[in-house]
Amino acid sequence: MDVFMKGLSKAKEGVVAAAEKTKQGVAEAAGKTKEGVLYVGSKTKEGVVHGVATVAEKTKEQVTNVGGAVVTGVTAVAQKTVEGAGSIAAATGFVKKDQLGKNEEGATQEGILEDMPVDPDNEAYEMPSEEGYQDYEPEA
């Protein structure tokens, strides 16, 4: 019985030592995980901010190729696109709400397309006649 108790005592010491090592390992792993999550979060934030600015810039470039009658609609779509991307960024916590509506230079993005000159020499897009279209009825 003495041998049995001595064996259990040794096992208990081993478990205590393993638990202590595990506790240290878990604490270290938690610290590294936190660092990793913060790094990914900061990189994602940079990507979201850059992405929103890129969407606005590309939309602005495309508007210069569009006739004057369509500019108003495209401007509204571009503004809603930027607002939507900003809302997603704010909702996910990657961008603070007070950072929304500012581009990388710190100027507001509102009105970015309104001051843009429109080239009157661009050909306007003409809608095709409705004769070539068929009514679509979805299947039940």
From Swiss-Prot:
One Gene Ontology CC term in the entry: nucleus
Disordered as annotated region, ranges: 100-140
Record PTM Phosphoserine, positions in chain: S87, S129
Location of region: Interaction with SERF1A: 111-140
InterPro entries: Synuclein, Synuclein_alpha
Protein name (record): Alpha-synuclein
Family under the similarity heading: Belongs to the synuclein family.
PTM per Swiss-Prot/TrEMBL: Phosphorylated, predominantly on serine residues. Phosphorylated on Tyr-125 upon osmotic stress.
Organism encoding this protein: Pongo abelii (Sumatran orangutan)
A molecular-function term among this protein's GO annotations: copper ion binding
One biological process term in Gene Ontology: chemical synaptic transmission
Keyword set includes Cytoplasm: yes
Organism classification: Eukaryota, Metazoa, Chordata, Craniata, Vertebrata
